Amino acid sequence: CNEHGGTVLNAAILLNGEKPVVVKLERMDELKVVFDSRDMDVHGEFEEIGELQRTGDPFDPFALQKACLLACGIIPMKGHSLKEVLERLGGGFVMHSEVTNVPKGSGLGTSSILSAACVKAVFEFMGIGYTEEDLYSHVLAMEQIMSTGGGWQDQVGGVTPGLKYITSMPGIDQKLKVVHVEIPEE
């Protein structure tokens, strides 16, 4: 899509009648960041900012969550003290995430959808207003931070309800145009 642009027709679906990705943040008094991935059965507690700024390890089960905090500007890309950052936020927090009914490597864009769910949860937790375009651009930023180069439209599919016609123009800066397609009930 960088050379020629891209066009995709995409539909969001429920799996077994449920949204397969859930992310929730909870505030806590302790000045640390906790990630809890229920589907992967991993739990991590972070008290040093440097640990949260490292996202390049493909085997790190929390690389995606760390990239979210960086892309959203919650954690600075370099320097600073986690204690100071969390004091300004009024305390630490736990980010719970769970992906259900979707096998890894299914091709359903689960990592992009999880990324978007993390961004949305952070924005809502912080009281930051956002648009669909904000979600898309932050997920693309996360993919750049992690150097994963995910699908340019994956995050649109599962985050934006219904049937969508998605296009992008050629170029590095991928601005997505999303047109919601109405389907008559007949």
Tell me the role of every PLM-derived stretch.
Residues 154-161:
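Short, active-site-adjacent segments that bind or coordinate small-molecule cofactors and metal centers
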Residues 117:
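Active-site signature of alpha/beta-hydrolase-fold catalytic machinery across serine-
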Residues 148-149:
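Membrane-interface helix caps and helix-loop-helix hairpins in membrane proteins
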Residues 111:
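Short, conserved phosphate/pyrophosphate- and ester-handling motifs at nucleotide-, phospho-/glycolipid
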Residues 139-142, 156:
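Short alpha-helical scaffolding segments that buttress acidic/His motifs in well-ordered protein cores
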Residues 1-108, 120-132, 137, 161-163, ...:
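ATP-binding N-lobe of GHMP and related small-molecule kinases
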